[in-house]
């Protein structure tokens, strides 16, 4: 009775007011699963293709009726009768059905919507939580939140070049305590910014986006907020950055427009070294451009034993890109975004490859999110140890944190919060 009876896709809105794909998969016994697909603002050139209508008369060209139609008319009819419990078989069939290396024919947003909805329907059929279905009996690690509380770059209209300034409550003893600590720092940051006369409106991911004077000032106000909340920077709470350096890379140089300077890869590495020496920074994501492999190698040689170096645009949740990084010895961590690759199975394969090679994994949202909480379950399913899903603000972000609170409650005394121990490959 776990055979697929019906597949229905529709166009819904994401947290930015842009259309995205939602899919329902209904099984023979009436059990069903629903999934909504996220969308990024800062996207890697090597990501799977998100199919948009490009019709300027609808949603400024951002409609997804073609992707929806591909599910309803092509994918749906093709997988009727398939066993929802065969996730690998269904995902492989979807990849074959599309037939392109980047899912450009049917759209990664169409394929992922189906893949996620199938997994949810299967979990519901078995009466299991999604994290347990995907991860098995040992899925019990609650992730440390990487909370993006200050925004710059593509996520904000200000003169800060670094895209995200995050806090990580690694000194907490449980996920719920970490969430509370993060929320307290977030509220204190609002007070700090207000006191300095800065705007406290929030950006796409719930973080503040004030017009600060420099990247360093952003770190300084966060350190002040951590202390104001009664915590010790570098002991209770650490700082993580997402530079999104591909967005800064022009003609072989990294252009920091907010600061009016341009730097070579070697100068960027020196810049990061100085920041890490001065502030409690434990993680830098996309510190170099996605195609600057030499820059990445230098960065890894200089900082790879001391802090987490995360590849997002560099790896785009893709096993081939990750394997290249492993072979070249660059980065030591990978950001996992379901919609960068387009199926649950490929995502799990990438996580497995990272694990086998000593890379940490961070499960991540996109800047355009929905109320879907799949990634919270995925983080626990694979014992990732870290999750990146925005500030403790805006329902689209908080939905994931609330799901993790429920999972922690359900796991009870078996739940593990690793905190600093999640960084198993650096001398933290």
From Swiss-Prot:
Its top-level enzyme class, in one word, is lyase
The coenzyme or cofactor needed here is: Mg(2+)
| Alphabetical UniProt keywords | Cytoplasm, Glycolysis, Lyase, Magnesium, Metal-binding, Secreted
Protein EC? 4.2.1.11
Q: Where is the signal peptide?
A: none
Which GO molecular-function terms appear in the entry?
A: magnesium ion binding; phosphopyruvate hydratase activity
Gene3D superfamilies associated with the record: Enolase-like C-terminal domain (3.20.20.120), Enolase-like, N-terminal domain (3.30.390.10)
Q: What reactions does this protein catalyze?
A: (2R)-2-phosphoglycerate = phosphoenolpyruvate + H2O
**Principal subcellular localisation of the protein:** cytoplasm
Details of cofactor binding = Binds a second Mg(2+) ion via substrate during catalysis.
- Identify the residues that bind (2R)-2-phosphoglycerate: 163, 337, 366-367, 388
Q: Name one GO biological process term.
A: glycolytic process
Which pathway, per its entry? Carbohydrate degradation; glycolysis; pyruvate from D-glyceraldehyde 3-phosphate: step 4/5
What GO CC annotations are associated with the protein?
cell surface; extracellular region; phosphopyruvate hydratase complex
Q: Which residues form the active site?
A: 205 (proton donor), 337 (proton acceptor)
Which NCBIfam families is this protein grouped with? eno
What is stated as this protein's family in its record? Belongs to the enolase family.
Q: What is this protein called?
A: Enolase
Source organism: Carboxydothermus hydrogenoformans (strain ATCC BAA-161 / DSM 6008 / Z-2901)
Q: What is the lineage of its organism?
A: Bacteria, Bacillati, Bacillota, Clostridia, Thermoanaerobacterales
Gene designation per UniProt: eno
């Amino acid at each position: 009775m776990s055979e697929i009876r019906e597949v229905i896709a529709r166009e819904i809105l994401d947290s930015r007011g842009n259309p995205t794909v939602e899919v329902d998969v209904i099984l023979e016994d009436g059990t069903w699963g629903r999934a909504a697909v996220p969308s990024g603002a800062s996207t890697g050139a090597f990501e799977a293709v998100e199919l948009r209508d490009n019709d300027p008369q609808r949603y400024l060209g951002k409609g997804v009726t073609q992707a929806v139609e591909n599910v309803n008319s092509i994918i749906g009819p093709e997988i009727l009768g398939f066993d929802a419990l065969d996730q690998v078989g269904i995902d492989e069939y979807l990849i074959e059905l599309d037939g392109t290396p980047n899912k450009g024919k049917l759209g990664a947003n169409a394929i992922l919507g189906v893949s996620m909805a199938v997994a949810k329907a299967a979990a519901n059929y078995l009466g299991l939580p999604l994290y347990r279905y995907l991860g098995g009996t040992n899925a019990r690690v609650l992730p440390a939140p990487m909370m993006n509380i200050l925004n710059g770059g593509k996520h904000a209209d200000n003169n800060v070049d670094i895209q995200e300034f995050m806090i990580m409550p690694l000194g907490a003893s449980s996920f719920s305590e970490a969430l509370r600590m993060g929320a307290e720092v977030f509220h204190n940051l609002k007070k700090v910014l207000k006191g300095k006369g800065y705007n406290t409106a929030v950006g796409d991911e719930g973080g503040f986006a004030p017009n600060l004077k420099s990247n360093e000032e952003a770190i300084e106000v966060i350190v002040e907020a951590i202390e104001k909340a009664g915590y010790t920077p570098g002991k209770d709470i650490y700082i993580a950055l997402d530079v999104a350096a591909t967005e800064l890379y022009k003609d072989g140089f990294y252009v920091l427009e907010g600061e009016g300077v341009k730097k070579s890869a070697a100068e960027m590495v020196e810049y990061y070294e100085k920041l890490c020496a001065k502030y409690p920074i434990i993680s830098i994501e996309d510190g170099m451009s996605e195609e600057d492999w030499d820059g990445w190698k230098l960065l890894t040689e200089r900082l790879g034993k001391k802090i987490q170096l995360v590849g997002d645009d560099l790896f785009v949740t893709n096993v081939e890109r990750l394997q290249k990084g492993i072979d070249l010895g660059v980065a030591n961590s990978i950001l996992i975004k379901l919609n960068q690759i387009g199926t649950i199975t490929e995502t799990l394969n990438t996580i497995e490859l990272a694990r086998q090679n000593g890379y940490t994994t961070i499960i991540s949202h996109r800047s355009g999110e929905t109320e879907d909480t799949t990634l919270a379950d995925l983080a626990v399913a694979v014992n990732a140890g870290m999750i990146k899903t925005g500030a403790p603000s805006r329902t689209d972000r908080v939905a994931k944190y609330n799901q993790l609170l429920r999972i922690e409650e359900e796991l009870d005394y078996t739940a593990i919060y690793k905190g600093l121990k999640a960084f198993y490959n650096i001398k933290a």
